[in-house]
């Protein structure tokens, strides 16, 4: 019986994995660690696979929306304003908005 418990414990311990969690540096936000997760959580339900105007699936699409488009302005609007994003969703928190602004100010790099 002790062997069975030992072997079971050994199997459990060796099957555990560790996934490194990406940390978002708010002074130097990166696309992969900071920007992409914000967009995935708040925008992709509508802005993917042709479900709404202005897809945001790729780096290029998102960069255009932030650098050349008006995405920053639209996420800063009041929730009742026409054009507010995310449409019928909760406003992004100030930290998320500042990360997107800082990413744009830093050149909107694909990193």
Where are these regions (language model features)?
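Aromatic- and Gly/Pro-enriched helix-to-coil junctions and flexible linker segments
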Residues: 16-111
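Sec-dependent N-terminal signal peptides
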Residues: 4-13
